[in-house]
Amino acid sequence: MTEATQRTSDSGVSIWLDDLSRSRIESGSLQDLIANKNVVGVTTNPSIFQKALHEVGPYDPQLKELGKVDVETAVRELTTTDVRNATDIFREVAEKSDFVDGRVSIEVDPRLAHETEATEKQAEELWAKVNRPNAMIKIPATLEGLPAITATLAKGISVNVTLIFSLERYEQVIDAYIEGIAQADANGHDLKHIGSGASFFVSRVDTAVDKLLEANGSDEAKALEGKAAVANARLAYELFENKFANDPRWAALEAKGAKKQRPLWASTGTKNAAYSDCKYVDELVAPFVVNTMPEKTLNALADHGNGAPSIKGTYEESHAIMNKLADLGINIKDVTDKLEADGVAAFIKSWDTVLADVQAGIDRVNG
């Protein structure tokens, strides 16, 4: 373990890797990251699988074994195999943490982002296909995704809610989670091992808001560059604390073994070279959060990260930052609505590339 990753973990942050591939699984890389960099979970998304499945070689034996199946089936076989194997690698981590950590996420088809029933159906299919208690099914926090989140949790299935950008949507996600856990309880499920994370995207907010601030050009605008994303996320943590402390249903569910849905900081790689490469880790350290990060960010954290608590005591300042943005005419809801739409579109584009690459692989290995 490095001092910085250990300090980050000791401060309450679970470090997850935002990456997965067949070569990473087979090389022993995950075991090394568990042993040496405090990594206790993995997230995937269509863009990650696009990168992984573009590799010629690691997936060929399974493609040959599958034969000339349709491409949708092949993609699901390849991706669920990777996730199943990764969950096995993280099983000991899961058991030692009472299934708080050791989780590996797999996302529903992004083309279903605005289809509630189809999302719910595929979430159940993926859960059964991976067939591991430390898996998590990723469902986007679109308006249509919210009831699917509740319905999936009600079946006792662990859910990672993805593509959350706004406080308004995050509050709806928490409500969907608590309702889902209440239904799971009513359905007789053991609540102890139902896990959930709320993937709140960070750096993309700065990328979008900074462009608006640069266009404004004033000294007041310049002083706010690089501040919107962290302020937004810190206020999400304030919302997390308040909602679970004050929801009248939660105390009874927690007494039955339910665990709070964890804030999960996503999109934490720094996209602006002027900012610290640990910015979206070091500035969002607090108890019971997850930070899922690309390996480049993980290596930066391990090398020179801080890891000290950094959210407590920042709420007043964070509210002030958001108010100043509004005073400059920046409508954060417009920004986050566009980021959600763009996020869904980007994942669909990646998924289309995955399908094309896997079809090419099927054709190549089967002549």
Task: Explain the meaning of each model-derived region.
Residues 1-30:
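N- or domain-start disorder-to-order transition segments that initiate the globular core
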Residues 12-16, 40-43, 101-105, 134-138, ...:
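Structural preference for beta-strand elements that scaffold enzyme active sites
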Residues 18-22, 47, 107-113, 140-144, ...:
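Active-site beta-loop-alpha junctions enriched in small/polar residues
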Residues 24, 115-121, 139-153, 166-178:
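Active-site-adjacent beta->alpha loops and helix N-cap segments on the catalytic face
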Residues 45, 106, 137, 152, ...:
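Conserved, mostly hydrophobic/aromatic
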Residues 48-148:
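Active-site beta->alpha loop and helix N-cap motifs at the rims of alpha/beta catalytic domains
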Residues 158-296:
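Catalytic alpha/beta core domains of metabolic enzymes, predominantly
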Residues 258-363:
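Flexible, acidic glycine-rich loops studded with aromatic residues
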